[in-house]
């Protein structure tokens, strides 16, 4: 019998405690604090009544995303990237990942020529910041669309079924779900999996950091990720079952 114990004592296929708080800030149409254990991310969704040039006169909207980490999000303070005058490649990569993932959760035609800008700011990082960002951003997006529906600018069909994301990895030869930093930093294999409510994949990012992996292990990773995403989608739906957390606007042109 294996004596392997995870860094925080969880079962191999057990998620960290997940918390989703809507209405975390007052200004954006959608605002969420999402927690995966000690990882905390603020996800906001802001609405702009215009689209990028490549979408102009298309009748479709757009969704874009930006990801960043606060200087004190990690144990050692990191200077702001804006102060360095250059955004890191990792930041660009995660921003694009969040945008791609959430575009799978919205009907851009139903959005009209409006843009939803998602901002994911990591307040505290302990592994899984990109997966927490995607999971929380869906809830912020849902609230932003509720706001637009109240204004009469979009139909109720703009929001598609939930999208969530989770990390999986190989730690000391064991497939583990939802890695904290202590595990993520030494994982032999590390993956991030984005899935829809129906079990379809939006994106799979997988790297053999310190080891190769077999087809059988790949299937184990996918099974663990599917379990984790299903739990996260239940958490998203539970959060969204409550009323919109702020006062809704009056319908325009009513």
Curated annotation (Swiss-Prot):
Record-listed phosphate binding positions: 90, 128-130
Tell me the InterPro entries matching this sequence: ExoRNase_PH_dom1 (IPR001247), ExoRNase_PH_dom2 (IPR015847), ExoRNase_PH_dom2_sf (IPR036345), PNPase/RNase_PH_dom_sf (IPR027408), Ribosomal_Su5_D2-typ_SF (IPR020568), RNase_PH (IPR050080), RNase_PH_bac-type (IPR002381), RNase_PH_CS (IPR018336)
Q: Tell me which EC number(s) this protein carries.
A: 2.7.7.56
Q: Which GO terms describe its biological process?
A: rRNA catabolic process; rRNA processing; tRNA processing
Q: Which Pfam families match?
A: RNase_PH, RNase_PH_C
Instruction: Fetch the SUPFAM superfamilies from UniProt.
Output: Ribonuclease PH domain 2-like, Ribosomal protein S5 domain 2-like
Superkingdom: Bacteria
- Which GO terms label this protein's molecular function in UniProt? 3'-5'-RNA exonuclease activity; tRNA binding; tRNA nucleotidyltransferase activity
Catalysed reactions, semicolon-separated: tRNA(n+1) + phosphate = tRNA(n) + a ribonucleoside 5'-diphosphate
- What CDD domains is this protein classified in? RNase_PH_bact
Q: Which UniProt keywords apply?
A: Nucleotidyltransferase, RNA-binding, rRNA processing, Transferase, tRNA processing, tRNA-binding
**Subunit notes for this chain?**
Homohexameric ring arranged as a trimer of dimers.
Family assignment? Belongs to the RNase PH family.
Function text: Phosphorolytic 3'-5' exoribonuclease that plays an important role in tRNA 3'-end maturation. Removes nucleotide residues following the 3'-CCA terminus of tRNAs; can also add nucleotides to the ends of RNA molecules by using nucleoside diphosphates as substrates, but this may not be physiologically important. Probably plays a role in initiation of 16S rRNA degradation (leading to ribosome degradation) during starvation.
Protein name in UniProt: Ribonuclease PH
Which organism's genome codes for this protein? Corynebacterium kroppenstedtii (strain DSM 44385 / JCM 11950 / CIP 105744 / CCUG 35717)
Recorded name of the encoding gene: rph
């Amino acid at each position: 019998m294996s004596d392997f114990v995870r860094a925080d004592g969880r079962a191999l296929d057990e998620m960290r405690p997940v918390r989703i708080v809507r209405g975390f800030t007052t200004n954006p149409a959608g605002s969420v604090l999402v927690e995966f254990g000690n990882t905390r991310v603020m996800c906001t969704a802001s609405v702009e009544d215009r689209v990028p040039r490549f979408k102009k006169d298309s009748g479709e909207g757009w969704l874009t995303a930006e990801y960043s980490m606060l200087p004190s999000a990690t144990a050692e303070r990191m200077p702001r990237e804006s102060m360095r005058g250059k955004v890191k490649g990792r930041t660009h990569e995660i921003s694009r990942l969040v945008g791609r993932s959430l575009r799978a959760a919205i009907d851009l035609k139903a959005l009209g020529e409006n843009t939803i800008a998602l901002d994911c700011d990591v307040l505290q990082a302990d592994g899984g910041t990109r997966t927490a960002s995607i999971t929380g951003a869906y809830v912020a997006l849902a609230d932003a669309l509720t706001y637009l529906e109240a204004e009469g600018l979009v139909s109720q069909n703009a929001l598609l079924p939930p999208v969530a994301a989770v990390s999986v990895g190989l730690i000391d030869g064991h497939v583990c779900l939802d890695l904290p930093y202590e595990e993520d930093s030494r994982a032999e294999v590390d993956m991030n999996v984005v899935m829809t409510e129906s079990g379809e994949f939006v994106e799979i990012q997988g790297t053999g950091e310190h080891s190769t992996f077999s087809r059988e292990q790949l299937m184990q990773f996918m099974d663990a990720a599917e379990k984790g995403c299903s739990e996260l989608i239940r958490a998203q739906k539970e959060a969204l079952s409550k009323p919109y957390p702020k006062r809704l606007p009056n319908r325009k042109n009513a």
